[in-house]
Amino acid sequence: APAMTAEIFRLNSLGFIGNKEVSSRLAVTCRHASVLMASVCKAKGIPCRCRAGFIDFQHNGSVCGDHWINQIWNEQENRWINVDASGYYEYENRFGFSQYDIPNEKFSFSAQAWLDIRSGKVNGEKFVYQDAKGTNGLEATLIYLFLDFHALMNHEIFYSFRPRYVYHGLEQISEVQFQ
């Protein structure tokens, strides 16, 4: 987050403002936007955490793509509110829900997705890691399980930081080892 903030101010000394020239904008992924949002909230004393999971942009539950969001604690409602800081909702009617209060049924947290696949409750192919390889199912969910686990510990690791067996060898893990 400090490096992103420094670059934002380097590109435009006014910092966080709207309607910037394209040359003054910082291109980031949903992960970067989530980390930056959490940093800003925490600096202002607002409880916030990053979460890595899968979102249903199609409205039918058939495909959920990998995505990072934030959860901001709402003291009045006594709940975590799911917020997407990455700005994909410029036309909220297109999605049918607000980026500032994403319904829980639209975002699948990695741990629940993992458990649902393993129990046979859902077809794992619907959870897709958008890596140009079509990675889905348990492999995609396991990748995001590690990312979300670290995010919950305030240690948001980069996409490629994961155990070696996740890259090659997941199919070699026995059912006993999974248990």
Where are these regions (language model features)?
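His-Asp-centered catalytic microenvironments across diverse enzyme cores
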Residues: 1, 10, 53-68, 72-179
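Secondary-structure boundary elements
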Residues: 1-24, 36
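Cysteine-centered nucleophilic/redox motifs
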Residues: 23-52, 70
